[in-house]
Amino acid sequence: MFVSAHSVFPSADCFGYRGGVSDISNIVILTGAGISAESGLATFRGPDGLWEGHRVEDVCTPQALARDPVTVHRFYDARRAALVEVRANPAHEALARLDAAWTGELLIVTQNVDDLHERAGATRMLHMHGELLSGLCAACGERFRWDGPMLAAPEGPFAAPACSTCGAAAIRPDIVFFGEIPYQMDRIEQAIARADLFVSIGTSGAVYPAAGFVRTARHHGAATLELNLNPSEGSIFFGATRLGRASELVPAWVDEVLG
């Protein structure tokens, strides 16, 4: 379903305004949990406010890691293992197709910590909230590819993995916890400032700083478009909104963009 959300762009096309491909050169796309939900990955917060049965405060804060590292590591080990059971869906594949075909600037900024964009073939992208398949040394800042569990002995005394660079037993999930600064914010803000089109896909519009990107984009003159299952908390700020399943909306939108 297409919803012309506001009178700012009353006859919005696939670019979120009255215009066409000749007016668009630089695109920034923000993706959230909604794009991966159809692959079988739980959204960050379900209707009950929990993430896979846990309060976010118990598994996604620096305080939780310090207080109960076993629970935190067990949680992310389970999320990492779950990635093996899922695959990229048509929405990821469509964005990878756009990534490959678009001759202007394009940046996919994902709030997701899975690797489904990469598996689909996207290359012009970044993870602002970190990655499940990465480990971070809290002592020296080195990052490592990490495919398996970090919790070597789930039932015994906790011991963090040792860093091969500095030797400290300080490896933690490379996840941006609440209270920490998202990654590559300078690059994201610069890309949004140059964007002609900002598109948000499958996001709640509730988590900052990402929830503020649409207003930044509009401030710099970009057209704005939301693709979501339901209107987000920030829908009012978009020039146009399309509602439906990401696996249907995103391929259709990419087809329109690429002609």
How would you label these PLM feature ranges?
Residues M1-V8:
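Extreme N-terminal basic, low-complexity initiation segments
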Residues F2, D13-G259:
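Conserved catalytic core of sirtuin-type NAD+-dependent deacylases
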